[in-house]
Amino acid sequence: MKTIRYILMLLMLTVTSGIQAQLYQDNLLENVKGKVKYIVYSRNSKSEVVNFSQDGKIQRSDIINPTYNKYGYMTRCQNLLYGTYCDKTYEYKNGKLVKECIKTGDGTAITEYIYNDDGTVRDEVHTITVNGLSKSFTLSAQYKDFDKQGNWTRRIISCNNKTFADSRVILYWE
């Protein structure tokens, strides 16, 4: 009888702890920590909202047929980019997104992410290849403000002697 109670208690703990666990690691795609509910990005006069479910899955209508590995990292999806379908793949290392590859009928866009010690993206190295011709450029970030969770809320991006400001507001699941 004691064994049955013990097994039932373990089963209940397993079920309830699984409910609270974050199953998906899609927050890595947006370089945020914590249980994020949504992010509102602003650059110049344009803004974009990215939503997440309570289990950590990104909620975007332009992400189609996502594939996940056993750790909850999105590894592949189809994406609607400027009205054209493309294939996206993602590579991770040490719990960070390190490479994103977008393939379309005309070419490939590869982004490699280089991180600061605090986990923020220092540089994004972009290589775009169309019809066999390649062009590379680097976006470098300088972070200005962070929220209580340690996620950046304001940064300056530099590329080829041009700068622009990014800001974001992040709401978290409780």
PLM feature segments, named:
Residues 1-24:
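Bacterial Sec-dependent N-terminal signal peptides
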Residues 22-174:
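Buried hydrophobic residues that stabilize the cores of well-folded domains
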